[in-house]
A protein has these predicted regions:
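Two-component/phosphorelay signaling modules centered on CheY-like receiver
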Residues: 3, 12-37
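Conserved acidic carboxylate
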Residues: 9
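Acidic, metal-coordinating helix/loop segments flanking the phosphotransfer/catalytic sites
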Residues: 19, 33-56
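Active-site residues of response regulator receiver
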Residues: 59-60, 90
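Receiver (REC) domain active-site loop signature in two-component systems and cognate sites
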Residues: 63
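C-terminal output helix
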Residues: 114-124, 128
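The C-terminal output helix
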Residues: 125-139
Length: 139
């Protein structure tokens, strides 16, 4: 079983930048990019089929046809992702959206764009560590 980080971002350049900034985790954690919500659910299906777990979802807010907050709320209704740590990475969420993310999606952290690489790495490390501890996984 391998821990996985989902990077849900519709803008290719931004998604690539997040992946690049998280390469430090690649030796021990599976990094899975997704360009939209449908793609994200397909990735989650693949993660489950491989016997791996989704430890962390890094999610943009504004995407075509939906929002990252709606996706994070939907994750709460899926047994495979309800315990996943959830981080909103955006520069466009309104206060109301953020409140919904916190109250209904159990948002664990918020990172504003543009992000600081060291802050992103520290947040990911903290969130994955919290997931491992919460789930009782032996690293």
């Amino acid at each position: 079983m391998k821990l996985t980080i989902l990077i849900l971002e519709d803008e290719p350049e931004v998604r690539t930048a997040v992946e690049r900034d998280l390469q430090v985790f690649a030796p021990t954690v599976r990094l899975e990019p997704a360009s939209d919500v449908d793609d994200a659910w397909e990735v989650i299906d693949e993660i489950s089929a491989d016997g791996d777990v989704l430890a962390l979802a890094l999610c943009d807010h504004r995407m075509p046809g939906t929002t990252g907050v709606e996706f994070l709320v939907d994750m709460m209704d899926d047994d495979r992702t309800a315990a996943t740590r959830k981080v909103l990475v955006t520069g466009q969420a309104q206060l109301e959206d953020t409140i919904v993310a916190v109250n209904e999606a159990d948002l664990d952290h918020y990172i504003a764009k543009p992000w600081d690489r060291a802050d992103l790495e520290a947040t990911v490390r903290d969130q994955v560590t919290s997931y491992v501890a919460d789930m009782g996984i032996d690293p």
